[in-house]
Amino acid sequence: MNRQPFLVAVGDNCVDYYVQTRTGYPGGNPVNVSVYFTRLGGRAAYIGAVGTDEGGALICDGLRRKNVDVSHIHTVQGRTAVTRVALRDGDRVFLDYNEGVMADFTVTEADMDFLRTADMVVGGISGHGERYFPRIHSDGIPTAFDFSDEYDDPAAATIFPCVEVAFFSYDGGDAAGFLRRMRERGPAVCVATLGADGSMAYDGQQFYRQGIVPCQVDRK
């Protein structure tokens, strides 16, 4: 029987609080990645910091229900990160962000031992990866990282050389040129999501394109 690949997502989490409905949902890039990976048949764990409030329980309980390992989540006295979100014409609009206990997050020695068991470690730009991704990389652990549209953030310069696969959100022209420039910063493979234009990847030799799947959007 084939072994399930094991992914550990590390970094930010938050409660996405929708102001119109006054409802909160688990969110954060690494949180979402861990859930998607289990949906695809892999094993996943999440490492990050949550507070001792209802938001922390929401994050942990939600991940458990999706079969994500939460054994290395740090529960810290204080508030869980919260993003307030509005819906306008069917699109999400991010209003403000309170980082809460994630502001001081970094990985522990116990976390590092756990990360060494992973086939891949993934992170995102809001999770203070500059504090620990260089060490993860130096230990030879395969890494992927989502820079969103913050690839010129000062922290990104520290992380680029430590990443095998880099993801970006990009809405400018000449996506191919953009991926070439990003790959020069260190990653072996660069992937840009392009909204309605799908996505594009570049491995230094060839470009790969993927379109979108049209779907009906409920604008209520």
Briefly describe each language-model feature range.
Residues 2-8, 62-64, 70-74, 88-215:
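Ribokinase/PfkB-type carbohydrate-kinase core domain
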Residues 3-83, 88-89:
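Substrate-binding N-lobe of the ribokinase-like
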Residues 17, 54, 199-202, 219:
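Short active-site-adjacent structural elements
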Residues 19, 56, 156, 175, ...:
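Alpha-helix N-cap/helix-start motif
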Residues 25-26, 30, 214-220:
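Short glycine/threonine-rich catalytic loop with a Thr-x-Gly-x-Asp
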Residues 80, 193, 220:
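Ser/Thr-centric signal marking residues that sit
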